[in-house]
Amino acid sequence: MKWVAATVMYDGSNFYGYQSQPTFRTVQDEFEKALKVIFKKEIPSYACGRTDTGVHAVGQVISFKVENENMTEKNIKDALNAILPEDVYVKEVKEVKEGFNPRAEAKKRIYHYFIYISEDPNIFLRDRVWWIPFALNLEKMRQAAKYFEGEHDFTSFKTGNDERNPIRTIYRVRIIELRKDLILIRVEGKSFLKRMVRNIVGSLVKVGTDVWEVEKIQEILEAKKRALAPASAPAQGLYFYSALF
């Protein structure tokens, strides 16, 4: 018996999130169905991040136990990719310590959010980015992003049904102009509340459109009221990029 961790990428467009749902298509269900085909039994899996409906992943980490020690990591990777649907792909499989749970053991999670800035939409990117038809003030957004860094009570930036401890630590928020029409918001933290990254992005865009002043972010953080923050940024622009252990 051994434990392995798979690094997985998926297009979240046609998934009702990562976590198993009784009546909807999810990444976890597709992954565990593939495991059952390979190993002829139900095998539970443990993921680093439970992405929401429409959210993508570049480096999701999923661990599980393998009883057939004769299967190499490459064998497992190839077998999974032969069975998984075309919108899920295993990039790597490696052996890990017994009982490894990436959700509990991740020291850092990194999310990327892409914003497409153009007068006209690019229909081929409609499930990949948030299209905004006007320029953003990136310098103001960078100043505002500093307020999110450090340990804070993120009650104002979570969904109402998330009852977990709202104290979270954000290591870094970067606003990167990849091209004149493509902005990357990179958020690094130990762990996140439900929709927290999308709520952060939505607030930064409010600053970038000059609707809010930079200091508004601090005001909303201190108020601890979700109603004061704007709507979440759309799901399709968000990617679970990687995790560090």
Swiss-Prot record:
Reactions it catalyzes: uridine(38/39/40) in tRNA = pseudouridine(38/39/40) in tRNA
E.C. numbers: 5.4.99.12
Residue numbers binding substrate: Y111
Keyword Isomerase: yes
Protein keywords: Isomerase, tRNA processing
InterPro entries: PsdUridine_synth_cat_dom_sf (IPR020103), PsdUridine_synth_TruA (IPR001406), PsdUridine_synth_TruA_a/b_dom (IPR020097), PsdUridine_synth_TruA_C (IPR020095), TruA/RsuA/RluB/E/F_N (IPR020094)
Source organism, top-level taxon: Bacteria
A GO molecular-function annotation: RNA binding
BP-aspect Gene Ontology terms: tRNA pseudouridine synthesis
Positions of disulphide bridges: none
Catalytic residue list: D52 (nucleophile)
Family: Belongs to the tRNA pseudouridine synthase TruA family.
Role summary: Formation of pseudouridine at positions 38, 39 and 40 in the anticodon stem and loop of transfer RNAs.
Subunit structure: Homodimer.
Protein name: tRNA pseudouridine synthase A
